[in-house]
């Protein structure tokens, strides 16, 4: 007959148990998934970087080769990102009214029409319109990707 070794818990005077109560790294790994704040260990050299984090002491080699400044490179990238996004949102014209505030969009439309009326004297270059592409002709009989169709015609 074979005997198995049993583990003792945290307390050496406790009864024998086949259950491991504490993982090798210390602490408990028992988690029910609620009301337990988990603290992530801070790793100095992690792969993923934070966009808005503190500047690293040793920037990656590609940043040096691109000619980025170690002091002002991040600030420029942070400030230009939201500016581009806001300007594209303001000029796109496709706003979605999720809250039902239609009067805000009417004001935007009247302001837009007023500004267009003032700038009619100046020729505005039109954006190139892509030519419509005719869709590919649909074959009259199509087979599914796996082989023959199971369609029965009588």
UniProtKB/Swiss-Prot annotation:
Keyword Nucleus: yes
Basic and acidic residues composition bias: residue spans: 96-108
List of residues that carry N-acetylmethionine: 1
GO CC field: cytosol; intercellular bridge; microtubule cytoskeleton; nucleoplasm; nucleus
Keywords for the protein's UniProt record, in alphabetical order: Acetylation, Cytoplasm, Nucleus, Phosphoprotein
Location relative to the cell: Nucleus; Cytoplasm
Record has Acetylation as a keyword: yes
PTM annotation (N6-acetyllysine): residues: 148
Stated family: Belongs to the JUPITER family.
Name used for this protein in its record: Jupiter microtubule associated homolog 1
Gene from which this protein is expressed: JPT1
